[in-house]
């Protein structure tokens, strides 16, 4: 289920727009994740106290974590599917330390798509959305395979 060179180029083009404000995009992705799936907030001790969208928007810690999440994802996307080295430590920490179910990775993938649609509607056409969804699915499938290797049933 790999992406063609053309699809990767589309993904990296839109990702270039994300990189102009990783922290802002990341914060928005996490806010959308927590609003759409409040149960995911339970996995984040640092953010459990944030109950409203305004509190989330005002949280520098949430913004920093959003930056961390999207920086890691960007590093993976830039590998165009050859992301074994980047994926292994991420899968390890998310399986053994954070215990993040694959389902939550689907939720955050949806949030990423929604934020891109919202912030970059003029550039986020059907082909862009399809390519990004495919790239995020590849990432999730590869994380799920690593989880299985680690014995995590997430």
UniProtKB/Swiss-Prot annotation:
It catalyses: Fe(III)-heme b-[protein] + nitric oxide + H2O = Fe(II)-heme b-[protein] + nitrite + 2 H(+); H2O2 + AH2 = A + 2 H2O. The keyword Oxidoreductase applies. Its main location: cytoplasm. Residues 2-148 form the Globin domain. O2 binds at residue 65. It is found in: Cytoplasm, Sarcoplasm. It comes from the Eukaryota. Nitrite binds at residue 65. GO terms for cellular component: extracellular exosome; sarcoplasm. GO terms for biological process: removal of superoxide radicals. GO terms for molecular function: heme binding; metal ion binding; nitrite reductase activity; oxygen binding; oxygen carrier activity; peroxidase activity. The modification Phosphoserine is found at residue 4. Monomeric heme protein which primary function is to store oxygen and facilitate its diffusion within muscle tissues. Reversibly binds oxygen through a pentacoordinated heme iron and enables its timely and efficient release as needed during periods of heightened demand. Depending on the oxidative conditions of tissues and cells, and in addition to its ability to bind oxygen, it also has a nitrite reductase activity whereby it regulates the production of bioactive nitric oxide. Belongs to the globin family. Monomeric. This is Myoglobin. It comes from Lycaon pictus (African wild dog).
């Amino acid at each position: 289920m790999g992406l063609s060179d053309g699809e990767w180029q589309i993904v990296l083009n839109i990702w270039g727009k994300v990189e102009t404000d990783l922290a802002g995009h990341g914060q928005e992705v996490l806010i959308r994740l927590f609003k759409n799936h409040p149960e995911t907030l339970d996995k984040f001790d640092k953010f459990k106290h944030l109950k409203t969208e305004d509190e989330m928007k005002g949280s520098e810690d949430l913004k920093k974590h959003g930056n961390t999440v999207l920086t890691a994802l960007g590093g993976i996307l830039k590998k165009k599917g050859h992301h074994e080295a980047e994926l292994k430590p991420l899968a390890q920490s998310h399986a053994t330390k954070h215990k993040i179910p694959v389902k939550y990775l689907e939720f955050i993938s949806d949030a990423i798509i929604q934020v891109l649609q919202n912030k970059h509607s003029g550039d986020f056409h059907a082909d862009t959305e399809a390519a990004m969804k495919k790239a995020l699915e590849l990432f999730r499938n590869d994380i799920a395979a690593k989880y299985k290797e680690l014995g995590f049933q997430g």
